[in-house]
């Protein structure tokens, strides 16, 4: 922005200078054309007037030449300043690019160092551990060396700026001296030219003195007056130009000093930040070194303890074998007793399950009623708030259009969009989800002696597993599964990861994908399709996670059928964020059990869906109140405050004027009374008896 403004000012100065040059050249050409005509009438107009014309021409040429010398200093200074600013901007951009490149490289190196710390705990050979620690130390030293190099470059650039500032001050001082020399030379040359031309004019008029004395005296007086005016105009222009040049020089000097001060402060701040970061890295390195030494000593002590523990456990093993035989006998007796207890508890469980279902239906009924009442109260309060906000907007419109005369733009209609579209839809859905989740949990938890219920649950589980296995075998889904294995491997348990590493290479990918899906709670084909839709490039899962209104995307199966191939996947850097949004929208979560995502909702956790719906409803309500409180911007509020202050001043002025008008009316009334009293005194009969009546004096 500063470069564009300086470029515009420079072009404006160049155009103004060209215009002045063209006007002076036109004046010179008019003088040259007029000179030919004056040569023909030289004898008619006389030597004095001819000398005046030639003197004006010469003075104009002298003035034009000296003005060019004076303005050349400013033009050269403007060009040099423009080049300096362009070079300064290029240097700033280069330094910024170096800082960004070093920050990115340092971030990558720090990430690499941080990632390798976790691998050191799995190394058991001391020599290998020492080699890895040594490599980590070398990596840290390389990071510190790169930052020291960048700090050195910044310090060199700062010193270069100091030297450049000193040189600039010297160059400006030289330009000022040169400008003063040109100005003094201009003054001397113009003064000498005026003196010489005046002498020539006087000599010409002295030659005609004998013939035209009276006329020449009048002309000489006019010429002297004209010369005085010219000298006065010249001095005025000279002083104005001097003041303008001084103000411009002072402005440029202040601008350069401010820019230098700002740049110096910014560079010193960057140096301090880098030094603090360096000290923090050194402290972190020292702390990690001490931790590793301590852990090494602890491991040595534990190794000794483990050796002693193994010897003691061998002795205990023989004793435990004897105890095992006695426990088997006790187990047989206890097993018979617990079977009888299990039959009794099963009957009790069935009775409690029926009571729980009845309680759940009552809970859904009361929740629907409460939600409906809440929606009605919310709708009523929302309408009241909208009416108040519309009144506020109407007042804002009146202030802008009638008081200020400004254009007023109404806010978007989306500001008054209702939070709950249907009074009972949100509560009914939440209650249904709650009931479905509870019923599913009860059905999944009830493993009793009823063989028919168990067979139905097993059949449903087998169907879901078959759907999921079919999706995993589909070659079009391998890209998405590979993306999950690469970016979501942290969801796999450490023990499971160790077991997967022992498998053959061709089986590791499928087993890893299944483990990740179980961690995400994906248990059937519909949940898997929803996950693939969330990982597609054109998915709106993040908008839905934020509670924003977004069009419902098509299913992954429809998308693949329309395209006839694999859908375009999201970038790997955004995969984790998409998975997080998927968990927030569908309420899935890490699951360690064999059922994956639970028993209800197609692999989705019902209670978590309810919590997600309630959270999104709360966010929409919070967003509604935020819109209502910010419908009038801070700028309009400041305008109201300023308008109120000015109207208060205007009211005070009107009140003062009203008081002045009352004073004027009082004075007029007193004046009328005095006039009537004076007329009464003047018309009194006693005035006729006086020797000098007042009527003769007034």
UniProtKB/Swiss-Prot annotation:
Residues 436-449 have a biased composition (Gly residues). It comes from the Eukaryota. The keyword Transmembrane helix does not apply. Disruption phenotype: Defects in DRC1 give the pf3 phenotype characterized by reduced swimming speed and abnormal ciliary waveform characterized by reduced shear amplitude. Severe defects in assembly of the N-DRC and several inner-arm structures seen. GO terms for biological process: axonemal dynein complex assembly. InterPro entries: DRC1/2_N, DRC1/DRC2, DRC1_C. Disulfide bonds: none annotated. One of its GO terms (cellular component) is axonemal dynein complex. It is found in: Cytoplasm, Cytoskeleton, Cilium axoneme; Cytoplasm, Cytoskeleton, Flagellum axoneme. Its main location: cytoplasm. Keywords: Cell projection, Cilium, Coiled coil, Cytoplasm, Cytoskeleton, Flagellum. Residues 27-50, 71-90, 425-461 are annotated as: Disordered. Residues 27-47, 76-90 have a biased composition (Basic and acidic residues). Residues 183-367, 655-685 form a coiled coil. Component of the nexin-dynein regulatory complex (N-DRC) a key regulator of ciliary/flagellar motility which maintains the alignment and integrity of the distal axoneme and regulates microtubule sliding in motile axonemes. Plays a critical role in the assembly of N-DRC and also stabilizes the assembly of multiple inner dynein arms and radial spokes. Coassembles with DRC2 to form a central scaffold needed for assembly of the N-DRC and its attachment to the outer doublet microtubules. Belongs to the DRC1 family. Component of the nexin-dynein regulatory complex (N-DRC). Interacts with DRC4 and DRC5. This is Dynein regulatory complex protein 1. It comes from Chlamydomonas reinhardtii. The lineage of its organism: Eukaryota, Viridiplantae, Chlorophyta, core chlorophytes, Chlorophyceae.
């Amino acid at each position: 922005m500063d470069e564009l403004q300086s470029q515009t000012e420079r072009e404006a100065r160049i155009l103004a200078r060209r215009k002045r040059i063209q006007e002076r050249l036109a004046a010179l050409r008019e003088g040259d054309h007029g000179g030919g005509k004056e040569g023909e009438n030289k004898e008619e107009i006389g030597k004095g007037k001819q000398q005046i014309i030639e003197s004006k021409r010469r003075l104009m040429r002298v003035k034009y030449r000296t003005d060019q010398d004076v303005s050349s200093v400013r033009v050269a200074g403007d060009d040099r300043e423009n080049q300096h600013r362009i070079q300064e901007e290029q240097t700033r951009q280069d330094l910024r690019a170096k800082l960004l490149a070093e920050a990115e490289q340092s971030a990558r190196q720090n990430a690499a160092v941080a990632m390798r710390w976790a691998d050191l705990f799995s190394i058991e050979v001391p020599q290998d551990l020492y080699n890895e620690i040594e490599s980590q130390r070398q990596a840290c030293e390389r990071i510190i060396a790169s930052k020291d190099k960048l700090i050195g470059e910044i310090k060199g650039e700062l010193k270069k700026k100091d030297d450049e500032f000193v040189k600039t001050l010297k160059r400006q001082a030289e330009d000022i001296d040169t400008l003063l020399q040109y100005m003094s030379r201009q003054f001397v040359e113009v003064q000498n030219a005026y003196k010489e031309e005046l002498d020539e004019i006087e000599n010409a008029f002295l030659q005609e003195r004998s013939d035209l004395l009276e006329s020449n005296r009048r002309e000489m007086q006019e010429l002297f007056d004209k010369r005085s005016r010219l000298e006065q105009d010249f001095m005025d222009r000279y002083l104005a130009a001097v003041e303008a040049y001084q103000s411009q020089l002072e402005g440029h000097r202040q601008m350069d000093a401010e820019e230098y001060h700002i740049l110096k402060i910014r560079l010193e701040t960057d140096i301090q930040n880098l030094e603090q970061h360096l000290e923090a890295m050194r402290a972190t390195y020292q702390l990690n070194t001490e931790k590793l030494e301590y852990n090494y000593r602890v491991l040595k002590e534990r190794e000794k303890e483990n050796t002693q523990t193994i010897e003691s456990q061998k002795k205990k093993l023989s004793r435990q074998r004897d105890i095992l035989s006695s426990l088997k006998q006790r187990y047989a007796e206890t097993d018979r007793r617990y079977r009888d207890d299990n039959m009794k508890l099963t009957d009790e469980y069935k009775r409690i399950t029926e009571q729980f279902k009845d309680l759940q239906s009552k809970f859904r009924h009361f929740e629907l009623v409460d939600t409906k009442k809440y929606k009605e109260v919310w709708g009523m309060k929302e309408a009241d708030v909208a009416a108040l906000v519309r009144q506020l907007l109407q007042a804002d419109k009146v202030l802008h259009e009638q008081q200020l005369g400004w254009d007023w733009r109404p806010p978007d209609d989306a500001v008054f969009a209702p939070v709950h579209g249907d009074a009972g839809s949100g509560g009914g859905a939440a209650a249904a989800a709650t009931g479905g989740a509870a019923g599913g949990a009860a059905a999944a938890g009830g493993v009793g002696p009823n063989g028919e219920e168990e067979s139905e649950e097993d059949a449903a589980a087998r169907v879901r597993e078959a759907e999921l296995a079919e999706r995993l075998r589909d070659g079009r889904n391998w890209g998405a599964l590979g993306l999950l294995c690469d970016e979501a491997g942290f969801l796999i348990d450490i023990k499971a990861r160790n077991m997967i590493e022992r498998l053959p290479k061709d089986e590791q990918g499928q087993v890893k994908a299944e483990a990740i899906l179980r961690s995400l709670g994906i248990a059937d084909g519909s949940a898997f399709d929803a996950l693939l839709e969330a990982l597609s490039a054109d998915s709106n899962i993040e908008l839905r996670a934020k509670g924003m209104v977004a069009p419902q995307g098509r299913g992954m199966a429809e998308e693949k059928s329309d395209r006839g191939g694999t859908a375009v996947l999201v970038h790997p850097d955004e995969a984790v964020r998409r998975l997080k949004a998927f968990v927030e929208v569908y309420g899935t979560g890490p699951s360690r059990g064999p059922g994956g995502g639970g028993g209800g909702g197609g692999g989705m956790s019902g209670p978590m869906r309810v919590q997600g719906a309630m959270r999104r409803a709360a966010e929409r309500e919070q967003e509604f109140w935020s819109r209502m409180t910010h419908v009038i911007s801070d700028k309009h509020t400041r305008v109201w405050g300023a308008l109120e202050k000015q109207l208060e001043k205007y009211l005070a002025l009107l009140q003062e004027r009203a008081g002045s008008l009352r004073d004027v009316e009082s004075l007029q009334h007193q004046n009328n009374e005095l006039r009537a009293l004076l007329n009464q005194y003047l018309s009194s009969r006693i005035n006729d008896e006086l020797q000098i009546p007042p009527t003769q004096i007034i």
